[in-house]
């Protein structure tokens, strides 16, 4: 993330938008189950909302500094933070009842790696498990937040085909 994006993702405005808007809307009437995987928690705004609602949450974060910060902040809670690449997770098959991925898939540097992340997530989900997430669509403001940053947009009209390519 570039500096502007990193600051915004840690802001009170973003926290309010996520915790009072996006998360309740996306997860309304959804039972996530007892073991939940969060992919790419970043600074942990979505993690904070989730950990109050699920018994056990495992987060996979590729960024060393973000993973270290989350581990320290969430030590002693129901959250396990794993520093790692979600395209190559070390969990056994069928480890989680559900997986969530919020506003981060566009940070994965290629469609092929996005497909790999989707396939790997499918592998670690129990049969019939849920994969739930959201991402931003491309807009002028969205692109400004990603100047000099990795940004491979996930377009809604192409996502079903992308899931098919990942053999999910």
Protein language model features and the residues they cover:
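A conserved beta-strand element that flanks and buttresses the S-adenosyl-L-methionine
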Residues: 100-101
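Class I SAM-dependent methyltransferase SAM/SAH-binding core
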Residues: 43-88
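A short glycine-rich, Lys/Arg-flanked "PGG" loop and its adjoining helix->strand segment in the class I
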Residues: 115-127
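Conserved alpha-helix/loop element of class I SAM-dependent methyltransferases that forms part
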Residues: 15-34
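Class I SAM-dependent methyltransferase Rossmann-like catalytic core
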Residues: 1-17
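Conserved class I S-adenosyl-L-methionine
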Residues: 33-42
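Conserved beta-strand signature within the Rossmann-like core of class I S-adenosyl-L-methionine
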Residues: 128-135
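Conserved small/polar residues in nucleotide/adenosyl-binding loops
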Residues: 166-168
């Amino acid at each position: 993330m570039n500096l502007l994006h990193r600051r915004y993702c840690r802001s009170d405005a973003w926290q309010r938008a996520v915790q009072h808007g996006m998360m309740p809307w996306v997860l309304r009437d959804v039972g996530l189950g007892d073991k939940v995987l969060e992919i790419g928690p970043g600074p942990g705004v979505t993690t904070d909302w989730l950990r109050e609602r699920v018994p056990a949450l495992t987060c996979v974060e590729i960024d060393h500094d973000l993973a270290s910060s989350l581990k320290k902040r969430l030590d002693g809670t129901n959250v396990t933070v794993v520093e790692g690449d979600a395209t190559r997770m070390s969990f056994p098959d069928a480890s989680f009842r559900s997986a969530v991925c919020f506003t981060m898939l566009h940070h994965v540097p290629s469609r092929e790696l996005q497909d790999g992340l989707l396939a790997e997530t499918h592998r670690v989900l129990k049969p019939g498990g849920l994969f739930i997430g959201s991402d931003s669509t491309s807009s002028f403001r969205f692109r400004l937040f990603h100047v000099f940053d990795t940004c491979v947009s996930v377009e809604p009209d192409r996502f079903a085909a992308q899931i098919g390519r990942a053999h999910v």
